[in-house]
Amino acid sequence: MKRMTAKKRLLVVFIAAVAVGATVALVFIFQFFGDAVRERSDLYISARTDYPGLLDSLRPRTDHHWAFDRYAGRLELERSFKPGHYVLEPGMNVVEIARMLKLGMQTPVRVTLNYARTRAFLASRLARQLDADSAELMRALTDPQLAREVGTDSLQLFSLFIPNTYEFYWTVSPEDFVRRMRKEYDRFWTCLLYTSPSPRDLSTS
């Protein structure tokens, strides 16, 4: 009888241990792979943002902070996160979020160029839409070496910026922004050339 009681106690302890282990495993899985984002939001991490600043921006938008800290530590995210514009979608888990920040899987932003009277005004407008500040943008817009690189001079560089809406990575450098606008300028005029009627077409119409 005593022997049976001991066996029952051992069985109860075993079942309890299994139950506790299963509960811990479920909590662990939920923390790391459960939904950490409840609603869509845009996360902007500047190149001037440090890791505490990243966490300050991220925490109000997500749950499961303990799990994020554990996984981020494993990825050494504090030393390797990439700045950028990131979209947090409902249903994302902390593993996906941490990997997104480590790999720099940012979402482009729409940059709208309107008619600008001066380069200073253009730099100011762009600084509201990109991570670069107006001083950095102004240096690129007046850089004679960069102007020569894109086939113009510092006085004519301003004319490359055709009013339209473009997609850029939020962290694009001012220099790469200018290089891209040169390509957009060439694309615009090439398209216009091939879609405009020729003098022969006009004479026969």
State what each model feature region is:
Residues 2-196, 200:
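Conserved catalytic or metal-liganding residues and their short signature motifs at active sites
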